[in-house]
Amino acid sequence: MRASELLAPTLRETPAEAEIVSHQLLLRGGFIRKAAAGIYTYLPLGRRVLAKIEQIIREEMDRAGGQEVVLPIIQPAELWQESGRWEVYGEEMFRLQDRHRRQFCLGPTHEEIITALVRSEVTSYKQLPLLLYQIQNKYRDERRPRFGLLRGREFIMKDLYSFDLDQEGLNQSYRKMYQAYSNVFRRCGLDFRPVQADSGAIGGNYSHEFMALATAGEALLVYCRECDYAANVEIAVAKALPMIATENPAPLKEVATPGQKTVAEICTFLEVTPDRLIKTLFYEADGQLIAALVRGDRELNEVKLQNHLGCRHLLLADPERVRKATGAPVGFVGPVGLQGIPLYADLEIPYLVNGVAGANREGYHLVNVNPGRDFNPTAVVDIRQVEAGEPCPQCGAPLAQARGIEVGQVFQLGTKYSGALGANYTDARGQEHPIVMGCYGIGVSRTMAAIVEQCHDDQGIIWPLSVAPYQVVIIPASLKDDGQRQVAEGLYRELAAAGVEVVYDDRDERAGLKFVEADLIGYPLRITVGKRTITSGTVDVKWRSRKEETPLPLEGLSAQIQALLAREMEKYR
């Protein structure tokens, strides 16, 4: 490709809307352009990167036995109503009507439509197992689209669905996909961690997320450096860390704490440490008022609480409802003496001795609160957020914490959708059973952004060779020099004929500008044809990821470049 013919409109300045590195560089490098909030056009360079990522995905899905299909973006409401998710998705779902007033949606995901397909086409055990996948646009009406490709309203995903006879078959499919996903992200050049995860709105009983480590990541994960434990903090297992009792339980006592509502204020006023406080947080679980208890130095994990309760909706309770139920405003409520409100205590709460809690009377707290003596929780469960430095639940070593971008997730769905939509098979004895399903997604456009978040410097993007829009850029220092131009032209034609993806920067621009733009776009290998090419018969070759330049002779140059590329590509096999 000649640069004079390539649509790659670079920007000198960073657009004000771009908050994170990937958004900034993909805009500045001419890879994407904003069409509307959370909706982007992919320009030629961006489309080439996507195509490389998609090809890696296809190769790994096909190797695992997957078959590619294309499912409709517009989906009938009836299927979502059958599964019970039409209302669950709420305002995130784009809904529309046809001219006959029939309801449809723009697919945010494709469990219903793929299950309906298999329901009509698969009837016998002889047709299973089955792996079907697609690469397709998805749509979610995000309340606040941001971070470029990381949280958009239109995005590209790969979905694979497995259909098996039983749980053993699902386990095999899950292991296949887990390995295939590891292969995909390794080949894309990502530093990633598979972590245990919550299954969220898709549902199911077992799930892993594949996290690309990045400071811009919206997800928080903990992992162990000594063993293979890693988990999203939403479900990371917390060990109870008992406090060593240095005193005996003292009589319960009410003390005045006028105007002291926050943990910090109460600790200062009563001269106690935060780990002595019992935070009492009120929620509405599908409308029912409940209370959750954690230590004052801990954060409640709402995902864990919701999973334990098994409720569909979990919302912080309205303060006025709390006042009516307890007789006190938020900040002065506690577990002692509460009537008719279920209490869910974190694992650490029973170990407290002479703790502090609200007295359910405005302006007062209780001191010397002892669980078991002064109140009994409805249940004691793991509902707190895990923090860095805590012991690993598997080996006991200190946990590390990092931020990550979710680029993929795998789910064991079981019979959640096949049962709801009646996707059954008949076994060898003529008995009918629901098909056992798994779901496996990769955010293709998110993966592109995640690569940029990891692979960049102050000058621009540093694409891994496996996903770069072009592998090589040739820059003549001066097009006015006939010798340089002829060498550059000849090398360009020779490399292109050999199948190398090469850009020849033949634009009538300063060499300095071409170097700056080549670094911004992130071509992996740069070949500079300059004065030394004419005087000494060498060109300067430089990897974008390295500082040093290497002179190479013109004789046999094309073969040398191809050998360099082949060796580098071995990293991504």
Curated annotation (Swiss-Prot):
GO terms for cellular component: cytosol. InterPro entries: aa-tRNA-synt_IIb, aa-tRNA-synth_II, aa-tRNA-synth_II/BPL/LPL, Anticodon-bd, Anticodon-bd_dom_sf, Pro-tRNA-ligase_IIa, Pro-tRNA-synth_IIa_bac-type, Pro-tRNA-Synthase_IIa_type1. It catalyses: tRNA(Pro) + L-proline + ATP = L-prolyl-tRNA(Pro) + AMP + diphosphate. It comes from the Bacteria. Keywords: Aminoacyl-tRNA synthetase, ATP-binding, Cytoplasm, Ligase, Nucleotide-binding, Protein biosynthesis. GO terms for biological process: prolyl-tRNA aminoacylation. Disulfide bonds: none annotated. Its EC number is 6.1.1.15. GO terms for molecular function: aminoacyl-tRNA deacylase activity; ATP binding; catalytic activity, acting on a protein; proline-tRNA ligase activity; transferase activity. Consists of three domains: the N-terminal catalytic domain, the editing domain and the C-terminal anticodon-binding domain. NCBIfam families: PRK09194.1, proS_fam_II. Catalyzes the attachment of proline to tRNA(Pro) in a two-step reaction: proline is first activated by ATP to form Pro-AMP and then transferred to the acceptor end of tRNA(Pro). As ProRS can inadvertently accommodate and process non-cognate amino acids such as alanine and cysteine, to avoid such errors it has two additional distinct editing activities against alanine. One activity is designated as 'pretransfer' editing and involves the tRNA(Pro)-independent hydrolysis of activated Ala-AMP. PANTHER family: MITOCHONDRIAL RIBOSOME PROTEIN L39/PROLYL-TRNA LIGASE FAMILY MEMBER, PROLINE--TRNA LIGASE. Belongs to the class-II aminoacyl-tRNA synthetase family. ProS type 1 subfamily. This is Proline--tRNA ligase. It comes from Moorella thermoacetica (strain ATCC 39073 / JCM 9320). The lineage of its organism: Bacteria, Bacillati, Bacillota, Clostridia, Moorellales.
